[in-house]
């Protein structure tokens, strides 16, 4: 294999199925730490398993893998302020044998300045699809925004009145929009505008993930999730 082919292989996208959660990244990211389990796995020194779709399968905690992958991408550990699964994440780091991450998790220093905290926005798109139609037919789509930043939810209510007729559920920390089979394309438009609005409020995308489910004999459900974060300063009473 010449240098050009090898370089293309390292940057070529690869999809992993980790406990039912799909993640797409590059081989070079997975091999950032050659002595790790993932480094050995994608060097050919470790046996691999594929799922029915041909994705590499790892039978581990799919939710926590987002932090593993982000560390591989940036060599930095960033966790939500209210993160409560540190012991579980340590076990995942031990499993993947990522020594720098293990050291970060054992470092007692705070991840952020003590006078700041992290605000989080979760955006999810749930789409139910008919299994037996060709082309695939959308049955229903739901778009949900979840956050404790009430000013953001108020801004969405005030600036996205075009989609008010689709607003089906509003709660203290959540707002949802529902779209039927004839107007699911409007969900795409709303989602694009929402992502732009959220980023303009100072949030950056921390993580994206996709989850496929088959709940009924004639339906498939596809869930897309985006996590946005920003730092905020604590206000003294």
UniProtKB/Swiss-Prot annotation:
Entry keyword Methyltransferase: no
BTB domain location: 12-81
Functional pathway: Protein modification; protein ubiquitination
Subunit structure of this chain's protein: Homopentamer. May be part of a cullin-containing E3 ubiquitin-protein ligase complex.
Keywords: Ubl conjugation pathway
Pfam families per UniProt: BTB_2
Keyword Cell membrane in record: no
Chain's role: Probable substrate-specific adapter of a cullin-containing E3 ubiquitin-protein ligase complex mediating the ubiquitination and subsequent proteasomal degradation of target proteins.
Domain of life: Eukaryota
Gene responsible for this protein: kctd6
Descriptive protein name: BTB/POZ domain-containing protein KCTD6
UniProt source species: Danio rerio
GO BP term, example: protein ubiquitination
């Amino acid at each position: 294999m010449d240098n050009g082919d090898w370089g293309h292989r390292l940057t070529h996208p690869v999809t992993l199925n980790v406990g039912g959660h799909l993640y797409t990244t590059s081989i070079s990211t997975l091999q950032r730490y050659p002595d790790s389990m993932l480094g050995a796995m994608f060097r050919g020194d470790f046996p691999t398993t594929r799922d029915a779709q041909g994705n590499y399968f790892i039978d581990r905690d799919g939710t926590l893998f987002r932090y593993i992958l982000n560390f591989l991408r940036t060599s930095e550990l960033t966790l939500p302020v209210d993160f409560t699964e540190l012991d579980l994440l340590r076990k995942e780091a031990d499993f993947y044998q990522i020594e720098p991450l293990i050291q970060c998790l054992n470092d007692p220093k705070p991840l952020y300045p003590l006078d700041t905290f992290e605000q989080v926005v979760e955006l999810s798109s749930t789409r139910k699809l008919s299994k037996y139609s060709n082309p695939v037919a959308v049955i229903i789509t739901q778009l949900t925004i979840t956050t404790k930043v009430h000013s953001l939810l108020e801004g969405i209510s005030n600036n996205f009145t075009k989609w008010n007729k689709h607003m089906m559920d509003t709660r203290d920390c959540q707002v949802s929009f529902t779209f039927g089979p004839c107007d699911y394309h409007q969900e795409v438009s709303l989602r694009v505008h929402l992502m732009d609005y959220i980023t303009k409020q100072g949030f950056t995308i921390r993580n994206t993930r996709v989850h496929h489910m088959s709940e009924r004999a004639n339906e498939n459900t596809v869930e897309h999730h985006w996590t946005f974060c920003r730092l905020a300063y604590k206000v003294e009473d």
